[in-house]
């Protein structure tokens, strides 16, 4: 059996169905996970729980969107090194506007792409 890192994957997604789908994929691959419905909840989680293996970040969310979350993450020395994968339905030039992210996943999500990306970012022990 593959053993993944002890640190969970943080899923930041406001759409409950999308969030549950991502978490089901993570469960299937053997990854622990935590959930946040917006950037504010994600920052609160990070303050309480420490660094996940990677953050799967939606962009369009209420309360605090992914753009603002990412800016605050990069401004915080404790959080800036946590890898981020942007999860979005919009692929228009995002790589230019999100330098330094670990990858992009486009909706609708493809299980194989998610698994390959996570295996690269959070290798098995």
Tell where the protein language model's regions lie, with residue ranges.
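Active-site residues of response regulator receiver
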Residues: 57-58
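Helix N-cap/capping motif at the beta->alpha junctions
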Residues: 35-44, 66
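Two-component/phosphorelay signaling modules centered on CheY-like receiver
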Residues: 16-34, 103
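Receiver (REC) domain active-site loop signature in two-component systems and cognate sites
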Residues: 61
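Non-catalytic signal-transmission and effector/linker regions of two-component phosphorelay proteins
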Residues: 1-10, 110-125
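Alpha4 helix (beta4-alpha4-beta5 surface) of REC/receiver domains from two-component response regulators
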Residues: 68, 90-106, 112-116
């Amino acid at each position: 059996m593959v053993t993944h890192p002890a640190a969970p994957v943080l899923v930041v997604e406001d759409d409950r169905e999308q969030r549950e789908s991502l978490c089901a994929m993570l469960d299937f691959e053997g990854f622990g996970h935590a959930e946040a419905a917006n950037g504010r909840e994600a920052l609160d989680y990070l303050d309480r729980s420490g660094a996940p293996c990677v953050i799967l970040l939606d962009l369009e969310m209420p309360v605090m969107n992914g753009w603002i979350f990412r800016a605050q993450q990069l401004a915080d020395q404790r959080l800036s090194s946590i890898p981020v994968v942007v999860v979005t339905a919009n692929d228009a030039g995002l790589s230019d506007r999100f330098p330094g992210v670990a990858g992009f996943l486009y909706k609708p999500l493809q299980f194989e792409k998610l698994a390959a990306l996570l295996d690269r970012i959070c290798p098995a022990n």
